[in-house]
């Protein structure tokens, strides 16, 4: 079967793309405005031996894309007999509950409309839109979300939407996201189903998770046998061999705040900042950029990037 062709926007370091590639889709175009993210994208694909997208890596702002070039590439893929999909998660800080709530008129918020306009202009066979829970649950942002839905419906799309949590799918993080998917072909839309949940209906939160424990540098704690290890921070520390990773010693060195590094209890994520992970629990939502600091469970420092 011919692989569907994916045009990726707001690609970041490429994790959404990687998910599609793993499921047999072909990412043929990558658009990411932030150069460090795009460099990380290129590097990781090179390491994994994944060929570069045939229409290249594009660091143009989505607001400034040359429509004719994109249209030509979309048509080329369709003429090759391929289904074409647009995927993207526009920057979310303006809709985030923990952010500044500038909404659709914010510098980042307006890019959601730009992406939806792009979908309506180029009419891919399907599209995916991803954003934070605040776009779905906050009244003024929800009105904007519903307006975007009406626009893609008028363009001929049948829609599926769902507020999902990453932990439902086995990721060790409590991370809500609204997913909107649209299909031009109604027959194709009827085949779509929300599947793949490892822990559906909130079952991941029903285990007897630890809450907080006294912080102890390099302390040892055993996991309760009733807790699934794959949903725990420590499991992934060990699986990814973070202690021997190239960045293992490269952590943020604070000029102030060391006392808090030494006193916040393991698992105490009750504050907006200085949240200490618990080794035998999933992570709270990672939302860096809102002055968040996530502390290592049993070391006097922040976590490193592995």
What does each model-found stretch correspond to?
Residues 73-78, 166-168, 271-274:
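Short, P/G- and charge-enriched loop/turn segments at secondary-structure junctions
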Residues 233-306:
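C-terminal target-recognition/interaction regions appended to catalytic cores
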